[in-house]
Amino acid sequence: MDCRSLYDLWCEKVTDPELQADLKGMDESGDEAVIEDAFYRTLEFGTAGLRGVLGAGTNRMNIHTVGQATQGIADFINGQVNDGEPGTVAICYDSRINSQLFAHTAASVLAANGIKSYVYPRLQPTPALSFATRYLGCAIGINVTASHNPSKYNGYKVYGPDGCQIASEIADAITKAIEGVDMFDDVRTMPFE
């Protein structure tokens, strides 16, 4: 699908007012390069998770790209279930724009997939997530942070059960699961509260 077709799909599917305003602004700018930059690719998931500029589009950090990544992680975890016991996930976030929203989005998707998550109730540094992931015996840890990047960025870092950044073979398996998820039709979710 080309960039303009993806843009049109997002205009049809997105209900979040902030993202709708961003989409409208792209079109009103009259600059096709703005739309192309937001939609020319999908944010790539790797050993460090996702990281990108905030805003509407497949090449941006937003509730839809976070939801898609989390659904892929949920599918990965549920495919690894031992003895019928679902895995658990620890989640923390920093003070960046939308970090708490993205953490709650991830928890909502995990819950809808039968996965319990432990979400810190307030801002936490990365070592707190590493500790919680190990201490609670979680399958995965998710840290919503863009680390050292400028404020227009946010990120979604994934840690293994050892509290460390995931290995490349796990990142590859999660990437494959994410690629099989349609961000508008396949993401299961429920209210956070």
What are these regions (language model features)?
Residues 9-12, 82-161:
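Ferredoxin-reductase
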Residues 7-106:
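An N-terminal, well-structured beta->alpha segment
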Residues 47, 111, 190:
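Conserved short alpha-helical segments that host acidic/polar catalytic motifs at enzyme active sites
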